[in-house]
């Protein structure tokens, strides 16, 4: 059998020719599932299909699903790199049946694929079944011809599969491969089952139940099949390897790491190359799916993975950012199967490089602290939790990175102490995320969707329409009517109201019936296509099955349209000015303004913002038509339409195009082309004007633009004009002369500040004459000793004053202490050249620092500086130094 890519294709081709729909991998960030941090199994994207909440146009499917396990229940991070089969990122091959076929067909497909297509020796195979699953036991005997001793009944949860605390579940049957008696280990269920002789290669889950709570389990509407086969594991077997990292894909990544570092993947360095290869995969795919490193949630898990890889790069002697340089090797291996890697290459590379550059600034200092803290520890000892927390809080070391750094020395970490330290400092728990737990309140919308189907949206063509009330929901339950003053949610068969999504706020307006009026305060999309109108009955009452007139607030909708279209123009302008790595990370389209988050590693300059604004407004002034078309996702992408990573699109998508490019590669071509379900202006001129208010950081690698359009932009400019006029009046100049007048005032202020600082320094040292400070000079052990405590002097000026004092003394020792407004002290000691053989400025300043409540200090024998928290001890510090000189 050939390489990993061919093995993946063989699996998918087998099920395609057996009538299965080949479904692309879903993103690593689960859609509409708050219970999961990352997609960790092939069935995740089909969860609502299994539970009956969603229907698909096919009843059988197969996929190669990208998965990440690095947090929560499924956490493989600690073992990655040190074992043969642990990964943070892996591909799960699976076939699925949604009420179509069940156990017999699933077992038949599995047996035919592994013995015929893959050509695995059937005599090396054995299986497990759940201990009460007689049906599966007998089917294996019938289909595979197994004897009873090769079908092992397992009574534990190992053979009862569940995705999590809630969700689909059922008994399973696992297929094992026997590597032979030359490898230690026993069959599943035996005391030696943890050995490496018998390796699971495929898990067949017979999906029969849904776990609602810990105590409640119900039958699924239709018995179904969910199977999972790790691509890395089956590839190792088919390539004659016992270790996943010896397969062709990992060998290529490790070879790239070896070439970049010049360190062979042998001995103590073997694990480091493996960690880097694995973590490169998970990091790149997470970034491609829209996750960026941050201090919480998914972003913090990504940061942990990246920093663990960077720590191992440091172990290999790499002193410059390394991981991003390995990205081309990954894309060469996996880019054809996963084109999102190619599309996001610039963003992935820039994010990896930036994060590694930032972390390296603290990595060496953190490792130095760790080395000092463990210098007296031995094998079996524990690092205290306080130090582990300091590494986490000050140096950005995730706890597992500290554990990994101590692993080779077999030193543990006091986890309890770490947790206590975190709680004492009220630090946020960053590595776990439990989701919102709002399933119960959402169930009603899925039930209504199942009952009535999706709401027909009319809002692209009209702002007013007739409809029939299908449901009224109050406090999570259906009711027959709503009376005046009641706050409820209303579902209508068709609506012109846009439901909040894609960053655009939902419409407001009124719903009017024969005997009542409902003020719509917001509209949301629920349950995969249900439009829910929220608000209050302001007059009379409304009831289910009543015919009503729905009218959208026209002025508000117009402003929303303008702001939404502006985000498209800004998005394209940002990509032209900053680079194609720019991708939308979020947005808020409100009536008053717009907010637009994009991936970019550094602040934008004022010049860049002006160019972006000007380019977007060029398209506004074109007043070109905004064109919308319906087409397949593949056709849209082929035409160059931008899609948002992680966004869920149906078989048919809406493509919005606006403007004609005027510059570079975009010249005479459609300017902005995006997949978008929002509402837009009919022509770009209706936007009126785009004015960027500013940009800021919202997280690592994410910048936020805020802007206004149309009337909002005019109001903003009018307000700014009034401010300039008021400022001009205060300065007694014309508005056009305000800038030059302010610059003159600032120059004058700087001059006065310099003169004041010089005067303070002269006054502090006694007036500035050649004998300045003579009254402060005392004779100690026959040496001139000038010591002063100064107020109103910046610490940064102390060295200059000390140099002047040395020059005036000719021969002697100088100690100057500046006390700041907050009571802290800074000290500088200076020794003239003729005395450096007797006295060291470093020793002198450390003596002063100790008296000031500090410790340490450093510099040269002739000039050194230190500090201390207690400036009230300045006199004691001078006395301590005098005593030290006399000793």
Curated annotation (Swiss-Prot):
The keyword NAD does not apply. The gene is alaS. GO terms for cellular component: cytosol. Keywords: Aminoacyl-tRNA synthetase, ATP-binding, Cytoplasm, Ligase, Metal-binding, Nucleotide-binding, Protein biosynthesis, RNA-binding, tRNA-binding, Zinc. This is Alanine--tRNA ligase. It comes from the Bacteria. The keyword Lyase does not apply. Its cofactor is Zn(2+). It catalyses: tRNA(Ala) + L-alanine + ATP = L-alanyl-tRNA(Ala) + AMP + diphosphate. It comes from Agrobacterium fabrum (strain C58 / ATCC 33970) (Agrobacterium tumefaciens (strain C58)). Catalyzes the attachment of alanine to tRNA(Ala) in a two-step reaction: alanine is first activated by ATP to form Ala-AMP and then transferred to the acceptor end of tRNA(Ala). Also edits incorrectly charged Ser-tRNA(Ala) and Gly-tRNA(Ala) via its editing domain. GO terms for molecular function: alanine-tRNA ligase activity; aminoacyl-tRNA deacylase activity; ATP binding; tRNA binding; zinc ion binding. Consists of three domains; the N-terminal catalytic domain, the editing domain and the C-terminal C-Ala domain. The editing domain removes incorrectly charged amino acids, while the C-Ala domain, along with tRNA(Ala), serves as a bridge to cooperatively bring together the editing and aminoacylation centers thus stimulating deacylation of misacylated tRNAs. GO terms for biological process: alanyl-tRNA aminoacylation; negative regulation of DNA-templated transcription. Belongs to the class-II aminoacyl-tRNA synthetase family. Binds 1 zinc ion per subunit. It is an enzyme of class 6 (ligase). Its EC number is 6.1.1.7. It is found in: Cytoplasm. Zn(2+) binds at residues 564, 568, 676, 680.
